Amino acid sequence: MAGKTLYDKLWDSHVVKQRDDGSALIYIDRQLLHEVTSPQAFEGLRLAGRKPWRVDANLATPDHNVPTTERSAGVQGIEDPISRIQVQTLDENCEEFGIVEFKMLDKRQGIVHVIGPEQGATLPGMTIVCGDSHTSTHGAFAALAHGIGTSEVEHVLATQCLVQKKMKNLLIKVNGQLARGVTAKDVILAIIGEIGTAGGTGYAMEFAGEAIESLSMEGRMTICNMAIEAGARAGLVAVDDKTIEYVKGRPYSPKGELWDKAVAAWRDLKSDSDAVFDKVVELNGADIEPQVTWGTSPEMVAGVSGSVPDPEKAEDATAKEGISRALKYMGLQAGAAITDIKLDRVFIGSCTNSRIEDLREAAAVVKGRKVAANVKQALVVPGSGLVKEQAEQEGLDKIFIEAGLEWREPGCSMCLAMNADKLGQGEHCASTSNRNFEGRQGFGGRTHLVSPAMAAAAAVFGHFVDVRELI
């Protein structure tokens, strides 16, 4: 009998009941909550007269709608009335149902997918859900993590279980070592460029290989964060010493004898050597260069030394139409060099790239330089209050401010047009976020997905440059 994949092990250990239709009732260990997808779920509990099944399995924080500028006025200072109501409602719901919340003025507040690992609320072997598609981030810890809808948020609150269908297994193996200046963001963009945004549909995607093993936990979180952009609902990386070292000593992590037992169990959270995957894709890490998206889908990506594609050379009519539409929206010419794309704004942040290592990489590039005259605004938005605090202790805030970038409060910010940080129509933005869809960062905004180092370089040069030449 063949061995088990990591996904098989996680799935099998959480099945409560197998159903006749092929689906299964799965136990959920942790639910993360934010202000956008939880209000109706709490209202559903209230209308049904139910209480959360396990209050301590939930952790909440506002992130999507919070302002990243001055917060001294608290929730009442949020200008947009809908955003203010959503944040207020989360506060009220968590208070009513007894759920721990890191409120807007709590220094532990931040983006859900940053604070979960930061607090040790994300642990290896867990099933983790959140009403947010980028919940796949937590798979970096060998946790089975994926986004859910609002009705499912209510179901988990009420029962701590979900009905799910088992996915197939996909192995993405990135062999060899990455070149200097090539980051986890470049790796995942290159993967998506290779397999497309539907390449992982129906699969749990495990990332392995020498290049993945060499990444820090923060880098692995970036990789798993964007598994959803490759069509996979969940991304996974096996447990190793880096995983255990990262989790150790965090507030929600096990302590004492429980820690020793947990580590012993976590060591098995890897695919068996004889495990069989439904599909395997291999890439050579040494071939990956810094990546830049040129279109309106994460799969529309090129190396920084490349150029914007010509729709006339597309492989079929559908691809030709897609490229043509993207170029029209993005205001780009076929054949233009990636390094000729000029930027109006720069955004360094989001659940993909707002952790301390991301900020260090960006600061190293802008240190001693100034934001280019054609760049109207360059934002740096830490992923949590604790990341912000650490960055300030290291003096990173001063480096950014001296270079002309804005240092903000934690939140989702310009990743999505749900708060005050937005692009204007026709503006090009170098963004460390995860989605470059039409209007994602603001009506008519043009998003180019890049790594923190590439975004920082774009801020000071005013156009894309190969960051490998700067470090």
Curated annotation (Swiss-Prot):
The keyword Iron applies. HAMAP family: LeuC_type1. Keywords: 4Fe-4S, Amino-acid biosynthesis, Branched-chain amino acid biosynthesis, Iron, Iron-sulfur, Leucine biosynthesis, Lyase, Metal-binding. NCBIfam families: leuC, PRK05478.1, PRK12466.1. Catalyzes the isomerization between 2-isopropylmalate and 3-isopropylmalate, via the formation of 2-isopropylmaleate. This is 3-isopropylmalate dehydratase large subunit. Heterodimer of LeuC and LeuD. Gene3D superfamilies: Aconitase, domain 3 (3.30.499.10). GO terms for biological process: L-leucine biosynthetic process. Pathway: Amino-acid biosynthesis; L-leucine biosynthesis; L-leucine from 3-methyl-2-oxobutanoate: step 2/4. Its cofactor is [4Fe-4S] cluster. CDD domains: IPMI. [4Fe-4S] cluster binds at C351, C412, C415. The keyword Nuclease does not apply. One of its GO terms (molecular function) is 4 iron, 4 sulfur cluster binding. Belongs to the aconitase/IPM isomerase family. LeuC type 1 subfamily. It catalyses: (2R,3S)-3-isopropylmalate = (2S)-2-isopropylmalate. Its EC number is 4.2.1.33.
